[in-house]
A protein has these predicted regions:
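Active-site-adjacent beta-strand/loop module that shapes the phosphate/pyrophosphate-binding cleft
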Residues: 67-92, 104-110, 121-129
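The catalytic Nudix box helix
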Residues: 31-63
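Structural detector for helix-capping/boundary residues
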Residues: 14, 34, 48, 106-109
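Conserved N-terminal beta-strand and adjoining loop/helix that marks the start
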Residues: 1-16, 38
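A conserved beta-turn-beta hairpin within the catalytic core of GNAT-like acetyltransferases
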Residues: 24-27
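An amphipathic, aromatic/His-enriched active-site/gating alpha helix that lines ligand/cofactor pockets
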Residues: 92-100
């Protein structure tokens, strides 16, 4: 299914916020975010999805990467401004047939060592945070 998506790159104290997925015997990581609803901008979708998935409100800043992966995906630098990380109540977290969703902080230097989807974003993140 092709769907445009907004995602957040949240880095704090040398760690990046990710969601660990365990599904059908496969373990991989994704950047928090989700589908852009009709009438929403990519930035608005990113804020909404981050709250649903992580339980935090974010300030969305500049675009770090734009990737074609099952639709156009926009990844923004974002900072947590309120909330409790890991307290998200997204519907997909409750559906057993969707596998496990585990919000976590991964040391940014380990980003290139894990299975991450879409991997194309990793280079942009590494370049951005080496500045």
């Amino acid at each position: 299914m092709i769907r445009n998506r907004g995602g957040a790159i949240i880095v704090q104290e040398g760690k990046i916020a990710l969601i660990k997925r365990i599904r059908e015997g496969e373990t991989y990581y994704v950047f928090p975010g989700g589908g852009i609803e009709e009438g929403e901008t990519a930035e608005e979708a990113t804020k909404r999805e981050i709250y649903e998935e992580l339980g935090v409100h974010v300030k969305v800043e500049h675009l770090i990467a734009k990737v074609e992966y099952k639709g156009t995906e926009y990844y923004f630098n974002a900072h947590i401004i309120d909330g409790v990380f890991g307290s998200g109540k997204a519907e997909e977290f409750k559906l057993k047939d969707r596998g496990s969703y585990i919000p976590l902080w991964l040391p940014i230097h380990e980003l290139e060592k894990v299975s991450i989807k879409p991997y194309e974003v990793v280079g942009s993140i590494c370049n951005h945070y080496k500045k």
